[in-house]
Amino acid sequence: MKSDPLVTIYIPCRNYGRFLRQCVESVFQQLYSNWELVIVDECSDDDTIEVAEELCRRFPSKAKLLRNSKPAGLQRLANSILGIANGKYMIRLDADDWLDESALLVMVAKLESLPNSGLVYGNYFYTDSNGKVLGIERQHKLASEGNFRYLPPHGACTMFRTRSLRAVGGYSEDVKAQDGWELWYKLFNRINPTNVDVPIFYYRQHDESLSRDQNRLLNARSRIFERLSHSLSGDYNLKNVAVIPVKESYPGFEGVPFQKFGDSSLLERAINTAVKSSKVSSVVVSSSSQRVLDYAKELEFSGAVPTHLRVLRSTEAESRNIPIRDLMTHAGEYFFSQSGEYPDAVAFLSIHAVYRSESHINEAFNVLRVTESDTVVSVKEERDPMFVYGEEGLELVNPGRFDDLTYDRERLYRFNGSIIASWWDVLKQHHLFGEKIAFVEMSAEDSMQITKPSLLKVASEKSL
């Protein structure tokens, strides 16, 4: 190594005194010795302070403890460290995790050998709450398989060039989770991310892990994409059309759009949710039933729903399922006939997705824009073990699930039927999805579809 630049390591800690000693000891044992350590206590009421003070006394010139009078939150804390960091590079180590002894050595060597790169990440071990190794996450595959733009590396133990973090304004303090996602997209086009194909830290899984709070993570991710999309805004306003295809009846489920869910019908709910989306320019209700369109018109005239477009599809298609792409292009062509302009993007919105919100629709269009994907689909993650048929019988696709682990390489997603958003040029090229497909993840609850009368009661009870 030509030089040994200083590395700033910071450890946020709130009531993780039982883990802190192992965490800090892993810093002390690094093969690379030019580091400074800042432990930040977030108003712990366990023995965090005592443990931290004892550890800092061992390296008084290199380690110090900061005590916040009230919890600052991860993003605000990170910005405060960014303001005082002396290191050329900066890395966050969570108090319940710990570093491999070679972590700093290999990451600094990588960045020093690539002066145009300002971010490096590596693999990591999963452990249980007692520190027993359960498996390994190999993050290098994210880049080698071309998915790295949409699947950022773990936010902790990713090493950044400190100057690069400062140049993009650090962390957004109103985003309370998924800090790795935000920085990844803020830095992606400014620096060249790189990786080391070795495990650099141990990631402890336990009941208090933030990564297990799915709704908080999904909400934070949605806000991040909203912020990123806004940063791309110019004087050209995208024309995004949302189409709600409506079939009047199915076998065993009559009068679908007229069915009540809470205080409104399924159609009324779908239209209002779509119109509330700040990313949607125009809403089109598409049906082969004139009765359905008349009902939509009545809803508009009564003030129950805002102004929207209505288009009658050929009645020849009444008895068959119409390909989703055809529904979307038909709506786009109708939009052109009314406005004289083709849409930039079209979103399919299922009338059956009663828990889909305007924020889900916004996120779909934001992801489509930020990731430059051809299509975005709404999905829910399959969290149960799944099998496929192989040469010797069934083969387990995601064995980590039996150890309660979620490897990125084993993540499986099911289309939940709620949203498909595609660029118009992709649809016109006779593709529904195109080549590059991104996703909006929705919770199992938000993914619920009303496909039969009995589910109306179940969904209504859930909403109480």
Each model region followed by its residue ranges:
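Short, acidic, metal-binding catalytic loop of nucleotide-sugar glycosyltransferases
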Residues: 25-34, 273-280
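Acidic donor-binding/catalytic loop of UDP-sugar-dependent glycosyltransferases
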Residues: 47, 97-110, 322, 350-367
